[in-house]
Amino acid sequence: MNVRMFSLMVGIFSVLNTTQFFIFDLNQKTHICYEAKFSIYVDSKSELVTWTLFHRANISTGLSLTTIIIGCFLFYCIHKNIYMGLLIYAMWIITYELINFSIVLLLNGIIKDHFKTLSYLHWIFQISHMLLHFFCLPFIVKHAYNLYKESQTVGRKRRHRLCSTIAVNS
């Protein structure tokens, strides 16, 4: 298998994996009982934590949909041999995982003691998600580097051919 094929597999993996974790995030229960609205989180005095908890579904939706779109953009860039698109994908995955890690870190601090085992599940999901994404990044970067080197070689040949044509016409 060549680096291009690995990059395509990374794109497929990224879209499917992001979709899977997006579904997990949307189906996560934070309240139990309909009348009492018993929350698994304690009340926090931090505005950032409260805002993150309140807008978690919107943040997850925005990040996941952006990642899926950028994953599809990765397919296009691999097909058209655009190395800059592969680098954009790599930078986005790093940003995406750091934001998700920050959210898990913030929200695990306010989980009630009765639900602490749930925080371990959050950590396992987050760390496995990060490891899987970060394991794939070297293949993307290597393919981008190969495309960059290839474009430099083609540029030199084109300049050499253009200079030869101008010299013959003179």
Swiss-Prot record:
It is a multi-pass membrane protein. InterPro entries: DUF4534. GO terms for cellular component: membrane. It is found in: Membrane. Residues 1-21 form the signal peptide. It holds the Pfam family DUF4534. Residues 80-85, 142-170 are cytoplasmic. The chain crosses the membrane at residues 59-79, 86-106, 121-141. Residues 22-58, 107-120 are lumenal. Keywords: Membrane, Signal, Transmembrane, Transmembrane helix. Found in the 3'UTR of TMEM217/ AC Q8N7C4. Cotranscriptional with TMEM217 and seems to be only ever transcribed from the same promoter region. This is Transmembrane protein 217B. It comes from Homo sapiens. The gene is TMEM217B.
